[in-house]
Amino acid sequence: MPASTIATDVRGAIKTALAGVSANIYDSVPEAPIVPAIIVIPDSPYMELEVLGKSTTRVKLNYTITACVAYFSNAAALDNLEQLIISILGALNASKYELSVVERPSVTEVGTTTLLVSDIRLSVRYEQTA
């Protein structure tokens, strides 16, 4: 059995859990996201050590799930963002993921595109296997 990795067992699992949401899903920061988009990025602190030993390493990993929609009309963009956030929250299994807060929306520029974005804080426990 191959060793577990955070890329596969955590970010990949989050991406899979979000597969039913109508958005492009990125498990790393894209150069130019296609909206609507969900981007999974490490938060700070990224890793909180829980068990560190010769045979077991267990950490709490903290992520930001960034929901992004096009910003053409303020009212429509906010409605689209709220719908995307509710879809994301519904797709993530609360027993596996710890969801804490959804940050207020903000406008951001990515390249030449203006986006309305909001961050969702998520934590998950990960144990390294051999």
Model-predicted segments: where are they?
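Charged, amphipathic alpha-helical segments and their flanking helix caps
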Residues: M1-I34, S44-A130
